[in-house]
């Protein structure tokens, strides 16, 4: 049963400027596994913007409670290389309160816009 849906869009150029303006922002928003590909290459600005949109979408699905940690919502590749959403800590606790135990994630980026949609299920 679906308990929540969240969606968010990010302007890639604006996000890229924010990362350039605030050097530690990427470390604050993303885990190392999110910032780099499996082969150790830095992720593209489009990929990071889509992952940030996913984190925002998760927060929206949970009702945007205060105190969520960005690192407690992680988008990493599954064994086939597709983006996979994992939650822990503050985000997992908020998910339990909301009755969410399974997540579905879709990421996209095109035309300078990154987007993400999440569906939370019981």
UniProtKB/Swiss-Prot annotation:
Function comment: Transfers the 4'-phosphopantetheine moiety from coenzyme A to a Ser of acyl-carrier-protein.
Gene: acpS
Binding residues annotated for Mg(2+), in chain numbering: 8, 56
Tagged with keyword Metal-binding: yes
Location(s), subcellular: Cytoplasm
Broad class of enzyme this protein falls into: transferase
MF GO annotations: holo-[acyl-carrier-protein] synthase activity; magnesium ion binding
Gene Ontology biological process terms in this record: fatty acid biosynthetic process
Reactions it catalyzes: apo-[ACP] + CoA = holo-[ACP] + adenosine 3',5'-bisphosphate + H(+)
Record EC number: 2.7.8.7
Necessary cofactors: Mg(2+)
Ranges annotated as spanning the membrane: none
Pfam families referenced in this protein's UniProt entry, alphabetically: ACPS (PF01648)
GO annotations of cellular component type: cytoplasm
Source domain of life: Bacteria
Keywords annotated in UniProt: Cytoplasm, Fatty acid biosynthesis, Fatty acid metabolism, Lipid biosynthesis, Lipid metabolism, Magnesium, Metal-binding, Transferase
Principal location class: cytoplasm
Keyword flag Lipid metabolism: yes
Protein name (Swiss-Prot/TrEMBL): Holo-[acyl-carrier-protein] synthase
Family: Belongs to the P-Pant transferase superfamily. AcpS family.
InterPro entries, per the entry: 4-PPantetheinyl_Trfase_dom, 4-PPantetheinyl_Trfase_dom_sf, ACPS, Ppantetheine-prot_Trfase_dom
